[in-house]
Amino acid sequence: MPLTLLQDWCRGEHLNTRRCMLILGIPEDCGEDEFEETLQEACRHLGRYRVIGRMFRREENAQAILLELAQDIDYALLPREIPGKGGPWEVIVKPRNSDGEFLNRLNRFLEEERRTVSDMNRVLGSDTNCSAPRVTISPEFWTWAQTLGAAVQPLLEQMLYRELRVFSGNTISIPGALAFDAWLEHTTEMLQMWQVPEGEKRRRLMECLRGPALQVVSGLRASNASITVEECLAALQQVFGPVESHKIAQVKLCKAYQEAGEKVSSFVLRLEPLLQRAVENNVVSRRNVNQTRLKRVLSGATLPDKLRDKLKLMKQRRKPPGFLALVKLLREEEEWEATLGPDRESLEGLEVAPRPPARITGVGAVPLPASGNSFDARPSQGYRRRRGRGQHRRGGVARAGSRGSRKRKRHTFCYSCGEDGHIRVQCINPSNLLLVKQKKQAAVESGNGNWAWDKSHPKSKAK
């Protein structure tokens, strides 16, 4: 078919079919000047164009030429035929509408005329005695129309007469009936698909209702005969839908906690619908959604210490992650925990230290004796030394029994509340600046012990 030829030709030349047109029926003896003059006269409203190629079609005993326009085809200005040498030249372009759009238009037309595909076939088949139209129907088109009618008729019948699913509103389920949320979603989708009058939609809606739901809609129709289907669905939503008030949405969000055996990422997925309902009921503002989500995860889920500290830091800096970023972070942490498994502590504590240094004497270097299988704990070469007067590493050899003297225990306290055992980033207690000031003063007065005194008061070298 010519349309197939156009599509194949454009595909072979890597062209956009929306900018190409195929001209058929050009006589073989048509000169180049005559062809250009005819083409310019016919395509002057379509803008600039160029000839891609030409070929000879044996079945028509004529030439076919492919043109490419500089812009998309304007179907309102496109001629169906071009008057030229040897008769009109046929113009073939890609249809404006796809097959699905064509079926929708055909469906709406048949509904407006109250006809079916069988009626269309009957009218076309019986209308043989009428006067010949200006453009005769070719046998190929007639065969295509019959094939299309036979293929489209079951689809149209299914679209026109597809019944809605049953909904009753009873607490005792009826066979074939759905829950309200699923039924409402299905019904709304079908109403958008139907191209029928409002009265027909209302009749089909009444056919699928049973019990209390039917009584509600019947009462509404008795008080208002012109009620729309959307108003009926809104009334059913108020009667049978879930009750989501401001207070209920707030309580549901606050009472959401991680269940036993539930992953944190699964808890976040379960928390998200509750958070969105809270936003819809104005419990949470949209600009604070991420902060509220992070707050609920910190208070309602069991998190590893490192992950909790990281999320707390995000919360304090007012830079909470979004929903997808938070789920990705939690899943990566869960995958890491699952990969390490029970050997996590042993793998994290495994560290290969460099060889212990030798004691420098006047004679030479004497290696230190090794005690058991332990290594001397020295930082690696890439370790960044802490800055501070009393934190420089001293040279020499560790004394016997002072194996842990290199890594001294430091007295840490929070610079926010003044309590021991945590730092300011991890603090959740109220601020106590007076206690912090007292502990800072005590630390300054005590100094760093004998080690700091030796560093600040070095002994004079013997000459």
UniProtKB/Swiss-Prot annotation:
Subcellular location: Nucleus, Nucleolus
MF-aspect GO terms: nucleic acid binding; zinc ion binding
Leftover remarks: Antibodies against PNMA3 are present in sera from patients suffering of paraneoplastic neurological disorders.
Name under which the protein is recorded: Paraneoplastic antigen Ma3
PROSITE patterns noted in UniProt: ZF_CCHC
Zinc finger (CCHC-type): 412-429
Biased composition (Basic residues): 383-396
UniProt region (Disordered), positions on chain: 363-410, 440-463
GO biological process: positive regulation of apoptotic process
Coiled-coil zones: none
